[in-house]
Amino acid sequence: MTNQQHQLAVQEAVKGKFKGKKVIKSRSVPHYPESAEREFKRVTNGYIRLLKKCLMEELPGIMDEYRREQRSDSRFDASLKLAEKVKNALIKVARELEQKLAKYKLNELVRKVAKLTKVNSLNEWKRVCEDTLGIDLLDDYYNGDFYEDALRRWVDENIQKIKSIPNDTLGSMQKIILDGFREGKTITAIQKEIQKEYSVTRRNAQLLARDQIATLNAQISKLQQEDAGCSKYKWSSSKDSRVRDCHRALDGKIFSWDDPPEMWYETKSGRVYTGRHCHPGEDIACRCVAIPVFDIDTVDVPIKSKKS
């Protein structure tokens, strides 16, 4: 069967659902992959705990050095010595973390998260097609190369994003210690600031998990819908208190996959446009989803059988 013959067969199988209309919107709303987000948060949190463990092993020695240099007669020389000691200690933390990372199997865990996101997205897509078009999809079609490039890029990028966390965190902690020394802060004050920085790192890791799962889900949704001949979608927000004003305003509106809307935010002076154009899930930590709009003239899905 040629591609054209297959498309004609699909159109014949689903035309009853269109009831004479050219386009129909999905009868179901795809669910955001919350289970994948939770799993990715577990991965990032586990990595941050490794970082904390390595840091806590070196921190007592750093604080001992801090205490000794505070008693030095020459603050300038003491500052230089402390800077060198802190730098070496944090380099050691980074090396130990790299060794522990091999046992943590970060690459494998991130790949599992990507696969879980794909499975969730595919199940939602199958549900949408069944509810709206009355057909079952051919599962094998979505295996192999269909998602492979997007998944591989996402995995590689996120492994690097996670691995970059210690560089930023350890750099911030080094600054906290050295600035504290120059300002004459107590050991207790320094430790509190370090704990605060760790909390910020943990929150940022959780934000990374939410943002990147949404990004991957958005990429997969776009692949599925455009492959099925859907050139348009309806924006659907998560409809809770965390939804941004911009996304709440976009909710329910129709957009083209080749023309994403521009993002904005409100200020006291009025609306400010960011210059960023995003589909659902592409804005930072966006949990919105794209509801497909099917067109009888272009619809083409890997049909398994027509529902009786």
Report residues per predicted region.
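N-terminal leader/targeting and assembly helices and adjacent pre-domain segments
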Residues: 1-199, 293-308
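Acidic, glycine-rich two-metal-ion catalytic cores of nucleic acid-processing enzymes
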Residues: 200, 204-306
